Amino acid sequence: VNKNYEIGDLVKIKKKRMEIFIDCGNPPANTFAKHYQAGCLAFELISNKQKIICNTGYAKYLSSKLALLSRSTAAHSTLYINNTSSCIFQKNKSINKVYGNSLIQKLRIISKNFSEDKNYYSIEASHNGYEKKFGYIHKRSIKILKQEDKIFGLDELKKTKKCPFLLN
């Protein structure tokens, strides 16, 4: 990804009246995963300084019950399968109390590509967070037109050889 648009593992594109942030990073090491939310390929869209599409939020300053609830849902602004997050979190309260947000199964970013030309910005990324359980790779493509306030997106599930069953 073009480092001019990447902050950490977030890709940020800002136009006059529109901003978009896309999470294109691998989960952190367990020692740094205390507040991780598992929203890989999730995005936030701001138009005219108003949030249009947003994530469920960062739980660092919430109560432990709200933080756990935030992590337990797959309701981030990204694709999910069968109400299952792309990462699996430790559900043992004692372990979470001592170590924070522990991940049992992590995803891996497979591809990440940012391109730009005179007409648009384009971001494509994919991860394997659903491969082990469902046999699919999740790919997200987002295109933002430069001259108009338009955004186009596509989510794809690509079947792998490890696919135990097909989705309807």
What name fits each language-model region?
Residues 1-167:
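Catalytic and substrate-binding regions of extracellular carbohydrate-active enzymes
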